[in-house]
Amino acid sequence: MAGIARPFIPWIGSKEKLIPYIWQVFPPNPKLYLEPFGGGGALLLGMQPKISRMDIYNDFNCDLVNLFLCARECTVQLVRELKFIPFHSRAEFDLLKEFMKHKELLQQRIADERNAVMECFSGEEREELLEILRERSRLFDVQRAAAYYKVCRGSFSGTTTSFGVKPNNITNFLYLFDDASKRLQDVVIENKDCLDIIRERDGPDSLIYCDPPYFDAESLYAVDFPKEKHEELHHILSQCVGYMIVSYNDCPFIRSLYGDFYILAFRRNNPLSQKAGATYGELIITNYDPRPYIQPQFSMFPAEIENGDLVLVHEPACGSLREIYLRRREHETDKNDAPTGAGGEAGNGREMSPGSNGPDDGDGDRQAQYPPDQPPDERSGGT
């Protein structure tokens, strides 16, 4: 499968190997694509950019966002810094982690120096000194990004918490930055709370792909995401009018929580297990009926899930939540716009039918694209 770029950073829960499954349920031609839990950005980096579509990468991890910004805007400086920083042992790994811990102090020092320049100098002298400080700040951002990258690359499965014992030659991966930098030129990069940006960017023509920390596996992530946060995420997504796709681990709690969504399941090899042949259950959850987009070999009937099979395991009794909310919005618009008639009822809007096949938005006639902006002959293979 030919993609624009590959992830340049190892990341716990990376979806690079799952792209063939997730892209199958992508509706074509959204006007906005958002990843609120950006992580390694495997899906977004692999998508063809499109003038008519805004792509947004978001993550709450400020170090990760800084790395993506530097990869886009300071690629040459970042690669040079990565070649310079030594990295051969646990001691160097721990030293880089210690540097990351004190980044706030270094940022505060730069801010204090800037304030001193503003107070003590004026005119051309002030501007010259401010430019020096701006360059120093950019250099610090690059140094910080390089340190964070090496901590990720040197840790077990990209967790950033424990040192990986395998030999790791950073220079073998630097070529990934070239393509990633070009792809990110067309991407808006944000550092916001996942729920806030979903609320901000939801719309009828939006496609939002969520890859939250997996339930009961939060200890593997560098962010606190308790059970209540999973429930809050579901609450927000259940009220969205855009196309929502969510990836999760297969467990009873998530199946129950998303009982009002369509749920597809499959099994994959488990890279975190030390047992040969170990597999892991995955869910792909949507607020719309995914079947019109999926390739013919997809199974629409609940069955014993073999490794690699994509199976629809749950269909909500109420039908598509997205269609329900779109109809509700249309109903309210008709009701507000229509004049009051002789019968005394304002705006006889269409009756909502939660169990119907949804609004006439052409979903059933659309052809699956893999991904939406790539031709069918690129559907085979994996990244």
What is each residue range found by the language model?
Residues 2-18, 28, 72-218, 235, ...:
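SAM-dependent nucleic-acid methyltransferase catalytic core
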Residues 22, 33-47, 57-62, 68, ...:
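Conserved proline-anchored active-site loop of SAM-dependent methyltransferases
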Residues 337-383:
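Mixed-charge, low-complexity intrinsically disordered regions enriched for alternating acidic
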Residues 4-51:
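An N-terminal domain-cap segment
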Residues 31-98:
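SAM cofactor-binding core of SAM-dependent methyltransferases
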Residues 226-331:
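Long, positively charged, glycine-interspersed low-complexity recognition regions
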Residues 39-41, 176, 248-252:
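Short, polar loop motifs at secondary-structure junctions
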Residues 47-50, 200-203, 253-260:
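Short loop/helix-cap segments at secondary-structure boundaries that form the rim of catalytic
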